[in-house]
UniProtKB/Swiss-Prot annotation:
Binding site for NADPH: T11, G12, S13, I14, N39, N122, E124, G203
Reactions catalysed, as given in the entry: 2-C-methyl-D-erythritol 4-phosphate + NADP(+) = 1-deoxy-D-xylulose 5-phosphate + NADPH + H(+)
Alphabetical list of SUPFAM superfamilies matching this protein: 1-deoxy-D-xylulose-5-phosphate reductoisomerase, C-terminal domain, Glyceraldehyde-3-phosphate dehydrogenase-like, C-terminal domain, NAD(P)-binding Rossmann-fold domains
EC number annotated for this UniProt entry: 1.1.1.267
Chain's role: Catalyzes the NADPH-dependent rearrangement and reduction of 1-deoxy-D-xylulose-5-phosphate (DXP) to 2-C-methyl-D-erythritol 4-phosphate (MEP).
Gene Ontology MF, one: manganese ion binding
Positions contributing to Mn(2+) binding: D148, E150, E219
Primary gene name: dxr1
Family statement: Belongs to the DXR family.
Official protein name in the record: 1-deoxy-D-xylulose 5-phosphate reductoisomerase 1
One GO term of the biological process aspect: isopentenyl diphosphate biosynthetic process, methylerythritol 4-phosphate pathway involved in terpenoid biosynthetic process
Keywords, alphabetical: Isoprene biosynthesis, Manganese, Metal-binding, NADP, Oxidoreductase
PANTHER family: 1-DEOXY-D-XYLULOSE 5-PHOSPHATE REDUCTOISOMERASE (PTHR30525), 1-DEOXY-D-XYLULOSE 5-PHOSPHATE REDUCTOISOMERASE, CHLOROPLASTIC (PTHR30525:SF0)
Length: 385
């Protein structure tokens, strides 16, 4: 069966890896739609190669520019409406959500309403609105297939298993670019230092989130919704080699782990062709060459963002959306070298402390909380500067 795929965020690291997978298996995958933010040069090349029916970019100006540069019959749209148009295109049956941040929420929700299966790589969608997204998927008979290597690993480990027999999920973490630094050393580190991830090729925002361990916190929150497991049963373990992508421990003491070379094309290909596997030419795992694997507990005093994620997830309501929004603002300013590394965690803490929670929020309440938190975090950082 051919999968007809729309990719939200086709010019980012996940999107380009996904298109590598499509190119490797053209008999199995066809591209229907693509979206980019501002990188229309790369999008133009992708349009020529994959000839999608529809694409979307950030602004009308970029859309107008792109129209002058392509000769295909591809429809060109823009903005949030454009994202939604790509996500809900009638010719697609699978949507890869790989845009960065909460901007992936609305198109994912609309895609589910249109009865599309979702290959989900956008963490923030489940962080901010996990209860809404998972319920919509159930109502519409849609599959949420994880793309993150950690969640793909758990998904594969649980294949054919009974969720009631799970004792705990163990999500592995590389530890990020600053894993071997002391708090004192981290005080003066800049974005350029954080962007050197030890194991994975990732976008800038995600690499900073990895350095603070907020990325791992988001993955814990994501796992709670993807697998319907309480936070008390989700553990994090530092594993510097990034060979074991996650583990599941069962009530009888048995542990199943999923291993593989750190290459995002593998979980993407698994998600695209689920429930069956395809051959690949990607690097194969050789444990004899690796020799040994190492594990340790995360240091929550050194990396408090992971603890914040657990606490906000347990509180629920709009609190996770507030956490996410404050992190997005602080992360972006750190990338511009406008704030210090520790200002990220301080901004998140103060913003979460200042908000008033709403239990079982509607989508509108979540979006309002997102906007409030962005403004509050911005004001905190403006006052600081």
């Amino acid at each position: 069966m051919v999968k007809y795929i729309s990719i939200l965020g086709s010019t980012g690291s996940i999107g380009t890896s996904a298109l590598d997978v499509v190119s490797a298996h053209p008999e199995h995958f066809k591209i229907v739609g693509l979206t980019a933010n501002y990188n229309i040069e790369l999008l133009e090349q992708q349009i020529k190669t994959f000839q999608p029916r529809i694409v979307s970019v950030a602004t009308k100006e970029l859309a107008d520019t792109l129209r002058t540069r392509i000769s295909t019959n591809t429809k060109i749209t823009y903005g949030t409406d454009g994202l939604i148009a790509v996500a809900t295109h009638p010719n697609s049956n699978l949507v890869l959500s790989s845009v960065v941040g909460v901007s992936g929420l609305l198109p994912t929700i609309e895609a589910l309403k249109a009865k599309k299966d979702i290959a989900i790589a956008n963490k923030e969608t489940l962080v901010a609105a996990g209860h809404i997204v998972t319920e919509l998927a159930k109502q519409n008979g849609c599959r949420l297939i994880p793309v993150d290597s950690e969640h793909s690993a758990i998904f594969q480990c649980l294949n054919g298993e009974n969720n009631k027999e799970i004792d705990k999920l163990i999500v592995t973490a590389s530890g990020g670019a600053f894993r071997d630094k002391t708090r004192e050393e981290m005080k003066t580190l800049q974005a350029k230092d954080a962007l050197k991830h030890p194991n994975w090729l990732m976008g800038a925002k995600l690499t900073i989130d990895s350095a603070t361990l907020m990325n791992k916190g988001f993955e814990v929150m994501e796992a709670r919704w993807l697998f319907d497991i309480p936070y008390e049963k989700i553990n994090v373990m530092i594993h510097k080699e990034s060979i074991i992508h996650s583990l599941v421990e069962f009530i009888d003491g048995s542990v199943i782990a999923q291993l593989g070379a750190p290459d995002m094309r593998m979980p993407i290909q698994y998600a695209f062709h689920y429930p069956t596997r395809l051959p690949s030419s990607y690097e194969k795992l050789n444990l004899l060459e690796i020799g040994s694997l190492h594990f340790e507990k995360p240091d929550l005093e050194k990396f408090p963002c992971l603890q914040y994620a657990y606490e906000c997830g347990k509180i629920g309501g709009i609190t996770p959306a507030v956490l996410n929004a404050a992190n997005e603002i602080a992360n972006a300013l750190f990338l511009k070298n406008e704030i210090a590394f520790f200002d990220i965690e301080k901004t998140i803490y103060k913003t979460v402390e200042a908000h008033h929670n709403v239990k079982d929020p509607s989508l509108d309440a979540i979006l309002e909380a997102d906007q409030w938190a962005r403004q509050y975090a911005n004001q905190l950082l403006i006052k600081k500067s």
